[in-house]
Design a protein with these regions (language model features):
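Long, low-complexity, Lys/Arg-enriched
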Residues: 1-70, 84-87, 91-125
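Short glycine-rich phosphate-binding loop at a beta-alpha junction
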Residues: 71-77
């Protein structure tokens, strides 16, 4: 795990998974990177959007995130937008992370249940 100076600042959760739904282990891991967690909803991306639309949205969302002065950002969502935002945040010197989880599958008859258990955050490199 990255060493963060006293966890001061804000950890931005830029996903469509509100932190209120996280398990305690994930909350504690996020608070290692910041003294508070701020949820910023990852937008729905129109599959018919072209590259220019996507770049404009990435620029808008990156500016919004940077205005929060994050110590770290969890960025997960639609691949194209995610990639563009991650690159921009990295260029601005922001630590950008994604969640690593263990996938557990339980099959009972014709029903398959999948559970994802958070393990850690990993830095985009």
């Amino acid at each position: 795990m990255d060493k963060v100076e006293d966890g001061i600042g804000v950890f931005v959760n830029f996903t469509n998974h509100p932190s209120q739904m996280w398990e305690n282990v994930q909350i504690r891991a996020a608070l290692h990177y910041g003294e508070s967690i701020l949820d910023l909803l990852f937008p729905q991306v129109d599959p018919m959007a072209d590259e220019i639309d996507l770049q404009n949205l990435a620029e808008e969302k990156t500016s919004e995130i940077l205005s929060l002065h994050p110590t770290a950002v969890l960025c997960q969502g639609e691949f194209g937008l995610c990639f563009s935002v991650v690159r921009r945040l990295q260029k601005a010197g922001v630590r950008v992370l994604y969640a690593c989880s263990e996938r557990k599958v339980r099959v009972e008859g014709s029903t398959k249940t999948v559970q994802f258990d958070f393990v850690k955050f990993r830095r985009y490199e």
